[in-house]
Structures are given as C-alpha cells and as structure tokens.
C-alpha cells in the first residue's frame, strides 16, 4: 500500500489541522513501512474539542431515545457494510492477520454498538413512594462530555466499546486513540457523522498519550475518563482525573491471568484453550492466560500437545486468509518482549519452542517474534510475575487444588482467570475463589456485548459492556414531590 495522506484531527463533524504543528508517524509492523504521518493534538485542540462536544452534547441529549437509537443503528449498518475496508486498515496499522480483523475487531465492535443502541429506550429512572402525599422519582441524566483513551491492540473495537455506552446515555465523547494505531478511530468518526450524529458528539484527537491524554484528564470540562492501557499509565490517568476536577473513571488495565488445567480435564481441550489464551492476536490481549498451571503428572503430555499445536501456527503474509499469526504492533514492543524472553532464560526457565524473532524473507523487516513456550517455571520468575503482552506462555506445575488457587491469586493483577475440568462442582468451587473479574470455564477469551468485563486489584476499576456500563455513563437525580401543604417550623 502506498503512503496515506497526512491524517488530521476530527472535530465537530470534520477534519481539521492541529494547532500544535506537531506530527508523528504510524507504521506497518509487518514490514516497517510508514503508513501515514499523523497530526498530534495539543492543549488548544483539546480546548476546542471540548467546546465542540459541549455544543453537540446538548443537541444529542435533547433528542428522544428512539431518535438516538436509530442514529446509532445506522452507524452499525455502515460499520458492517465497510467491514472489509476497515479490517484491511486495521491489519495495516496493527499487524494483526486479516483473518482476525475481518471476523473479530469490527464485528464485535459493531455488536456492542448495536447492543447499546437497543438499550437506549430502556434507560429509565424509578418511583419511590414515601407516604400518601409524597413520592420521589429519579432520572438518569448524561454526564456531559466524557473522554475515552484507547490502547493499541484493538483500536476500533476499543473505540466502539467506549463510545457506544457513552453516546447511548446521551453524552458526547472525545476519543484519543493510541499513537501506535490511530487510523481506524478516525474512520469511526466519519461513520458516526454519516449516520447522523450531531457535530461534536464524537471527536477524535490523535496525539502522544503523555501529552494529549494528560490534557484530556486535566480538562475541567470533561466529566469522566475511560482508559484502557497499562497499570502505570492508568494510575497517572486516575490521579490526574481526580486532581483536576474529581472526574469519574473507568480503568481497564493489565493482567497476568491464570489458566488452571485439572487432572480430569481433556488435555486436547486444555491445549486448544491454552493456545488461544496465549497466541491469539500474537499474544497482545490483556486477558491472556499466560500462567498455565498443570498437574505435575500431566505436564509432559500437556507439553507435547501444546508443541504439536504451535507447529500448526501459520505466520506470514497478513492478508493471506490462511495466516493466523502476525507481527507485534511495533519494533519497540518487539524489543521489550525479547527482553522478557531473555530474562526468562536467564532465570532458569526452559524454552520448549520459540525464544527469538522469526527469521526469513517474510519476517526480516517486520516486528516478528516466534511463538514461545517456557516450562519448568516458578512463581518468582519475572516472566511469571510481569505482563509481557506478547506470544509467551509459561507452564507451571502444582500438586493440589488449594495450592493452585493460592498461587493463581498470588499476583497484583486480577483481570481474568480460567479453568479446564470435567467436574462441574469443582468448576464453580474454584472459580468462586479466584480473584479475577472475567472468568471462563472450559473456554477462553469471548467477551460478548452483554458480559461486563473488568478487573480486580490493579487490573482496573469499573466495567465495560453490559447494562451496568450504560448506567455508569449517567448520573442519578432524585426529585421529591410533595402534594400536601408544606409545614414549616418557623
């Protein structure tokens, strides 16, 4: 693909130049080619985006629930009509295989938007009787202008996960995509405008997170920030949001999730789940089950089944429909993953496969890392303690149920967890003891629109998707009505 035109900001229904004069480049990680130069939003751009959003939000909130629902449903239709085009752009920007982006990223994002479009008319208050002459009723009102700050691994899906409930509740959103993968969020803004969203209700500000993101979290005109990213960045966003104007926050942060295989499990099923929990999207998924616990007596058989499946991974041309494994999102991220792999070797973990970059004409110019499986791991190893966010699986052994539950919970993270077992009683007994917000039994990774997702501990605050997320983009107003004569004590 030839280099794209310089990308601008999207404010008040159209593209506009950044006042900062600063730019950055986004690359195709499969081959290192520059895709586009992108303008970076500065403080003045954030100010005008907020003013635009405030104007648009008043118009949007004044519409009836059905009017808002129809506009968002039109956006869903456009997303599905343009699925292949958007998936190709997402593949170029992220490096993910087209077989994945065309069937997951836009599809699941559109599903979430459709879900919330349908919920808009059901957003309602309640009536509380006090006595015969008095009652209270409540209204759920929009927060106003909210900000979404996205991560680089699922750019358009995250933009939809954040904007769908916010817009459904009557808010306007200013969205800052990751500077690593900024392109499809701008296309989403076009689609919202085409669907009939009032100008200013969805503005997109590409920029460097440490600057543009901070301007958003500092701004007094923003009522809430929804952030997806790493724990350290999330803590800064939360601190800035509280210090500036006591903003509400949703934090979807990192994970180091356990996948527990029990001795009664079908090992073929367990190996299939472990593969998806570690190598889907080249391991760049926050919910990955990177700590794979297996009974000592099952270790050798499990390892062989995993190795057989790793051999079936198809890396290469990301637009080949048979390819199911792409490069990492950037060269700095590739280098960071390689440092973790080197640390694992240094600390005594044994490499079953991988452990280096992929080599060959198809890979030499891209950010490729081979699918890597470590075994003979211990809980104190760096690769077991810290989030790597790459195609790196760590296999650990255990002897008893109580032991594995204790070790699975021995982490600052609490995003996801899963178990594989044929025993239904054990499945529920163990899952109820795991300290994680998203749990799976005999499966892994699905996050449908109806399912609230979010973490315990350092993995986050609040939830995305589900009914409760729509409510989190509203504030409750309580009104008492008195029909009897008011009695004053004065």
Curated annotation (Swiss-Prot):
Keywords: Metal-binding, NAD, NADP, Oxidation, Oxidoreductase, Potassium. K(+) 1 binds at residues 26-27, 93, 180. Pathway: Amine and polyamine biosynthesis; betaine biosynthesis via choline pathway; betaine from betaine aldehyde: step 1/1. GO terms for molecular function: betaine-aldehyde dehydrogenase (NAD+) activity; metal ion binding. Its cofactor is K(+). The record marks 248 as: Seems to be a necessary countercharge to the potassium cations. InterPro entries: Ald_DH/histidinol_DH, Ald_DH_C, Ald_DH_CS_CYS, Ald_DH_CS_GLU, Ald_DH_N, Aldehyde_DH_dom, BADH. The keyword Kinase does not apply. Its EC number is 1.2.1.8. It comes from the Bacteria. GO terms for biological process: glycine betaine biosynthetic process from choline. Binds 2 potassium ions per subunit. It is an enzyme of class 1 (oxidoreductase). It catalyses: betaine aldehyde + NAD(+) + H2O = glycine betaine + NADH + 2 H(+). The keyword NADP applies. Dimer of dimers. Involved in the biosynthesis of the osmoprotectant glycine betaine. Catalyzes the irreversible oxidation of betaine aldehyde to the corresponding acid. Belongs to the aldehyde dehydrogenase family. This is Betaine aldehyde dehydrogenase. It comes from Escherichia coli O127:H6 (strain E2348/69 / EPEC). The gene is betB.
